[in-house]
Regions:
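Active-site mouth loops of central-metabolism enzymes
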Residues: 95-112, 136-140, 160-164, 183-185, ...
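Catalytic beta/alpha-barrel core
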Residues: 6, 142, 158-169, 178-191, ...
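Alpha-helix-loop-beta-strand connector modules within alpha/beta enzyme cores
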Residues: 139-163, 195-202, 251-265, 311-312
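Hydrophobic faces of well-ordered beta-strands that scaffold small-molecule active sites
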Residues: 95-101, 123-127, 161-163, 180-182, ...
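Catalytic alpha/beta core domains of metabolic enzymes, predominantly
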Residues: 85, 199-298
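Glycine-rich, proline-tolerant flexible connector loops at the mouths of alpha/beta enzymes
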Residues: 126-144, 299-310
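N-terminal small/glycine-rich loop or linker at the start of catalytic domains
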Residues: 83-102, 131-136, 258-267
Length: 312
């Protein structure tokens, strides 16, 4: 349920309303916009009398929210969320470029790529230290050593780093990471989502390869319910009957999510296609459709990359 307040509501009446709602076990999320203040109510709102609340002098409107996601819902939070990462703002009309190697292979490799992508306009460095691979025989990443190489590259370039967390046991190693990425395969790892919900750093959730919009937003809801409201959504292609490309990039998600949620939307055209020659046109299409940023795989020697060279 959401309660839309009139402009400049009486402070005493507002405090009384909030106290009454809290007595009934309702959790209140306040969103202050340019025109109105909105109270988002989470809990058993079936016990609340809409007409009684609507009759209050300070209330302009009361609406029930049917969607299961509340914190991530634009009805709760009409203004776009802007996630601050260092000097970079993600969302709110800003275009963020995250670029770097699929896998960190060496200190020299990630350092050289970091300098190159910064010179090309990137504002964040992506790189995988822990890699979820379809085959157990594929390169699995350098692990903690890879994280240290990313930190060195950050120190040399000033670029904040975004890297994937695969398991709860790895969380202590991520205390110096700027943005935690939850990969497509872990989009519904609810224990992991709960854990990052208690972290004081942004979380980027990649869409599962067969996930609906609602399932994706419910994953964001898990993180936000833990108190972490700095959530970013990343579309990386979904699985369809088409096999020419690695996945199928769902650009329709951008206007749909723009309607459903206030969270920033990043597009990953590299994983979506698996082919480097498709990255440019799909990146441009994503920006034209209204994406808040791009996640691009870059390698200084794609032919000899240990992971995903063809799409870099």
């Amino acid at each position: 349920m959401i309660v839309v307040l009139k402009q400049n509501p009486n402070r005493h009446q507002l405090e009384s309303l909030i106290a009454w709602l809290q007595e009934k076990g309702i959790i209140i999320h306040t969103s202050i916009g340019e025109a109105h203040t909105i109270l988002g109510l989470v809990g058993d709102t079936s016990q609340l009398d809409i007409d009684l609340i609507a009759a209050l002098d300070i209330v302009e409107d009361v609406k029930r929210v049917q969607e299961p996601y509340k914190n991530a819902n634009r009805k709760f939070h009409p203004e776009d969320t802007v996630v601050q990462v260092g000097n970079t703002q993600i969302g709110g009309g800003n275009l963020t470029l995250m670029a770097g190697p699929c896998s960190v292979e060496s200190e020299e490799q990630v350092g050289a790529i970091a300098k190159a992508v910064k010179a090309s306009g990137a504002t964040m460095l992506r790189g995988g230290a822990f890699k979820p691979r379809t085959s157990p025989y594929s390169f699995q990443g350098l692990g903690a050593t890879g994280l240290e190489y990313l930190k060195v590259a950050r120190q040399e370039t000033g670029l904040p780093i975004v890297t994937e967390l695969m398991d709860l046991s790895q969380l202590p190693l991520f205390k110096d990471v700027d943005v935690i990425q939850i990969g497509a395969r872990n989009m519904q790892n609810f224990d992991l989502l709960k854990a990052v919900g208690h972290q004081d750093k942004p979380v980027m959730i990649k869409r599962g390869m067969s996930a609906t919009y609602e399932e994706w937003l419910m994953s964001a809801e898990y993180v936000m319910a833990g108190g972490n409201e700095n959530v970013i959504l990343c579309e990386r292609g979904i699985r369809t009957f088409e096999s020419y490309t690695r996945n199928t990039l769902d650009l329709a998600c951008i206007p749909v999510l723009r309607k459903l949620t206030h969270l920033p939307i990043i597009i990953d055209p590299s994983h979506a296609t698996g082919k480097s020659w498709l990255v440019d046109p799909l990146a441009m299409g994503a920006v034209a459709t209204g994406a808040d940023g791009l996640l691009i795989e870059v390698h200084n020697d794609p032919a000899h990359a240990l992971c995903d060279g063809p799409q870099s």
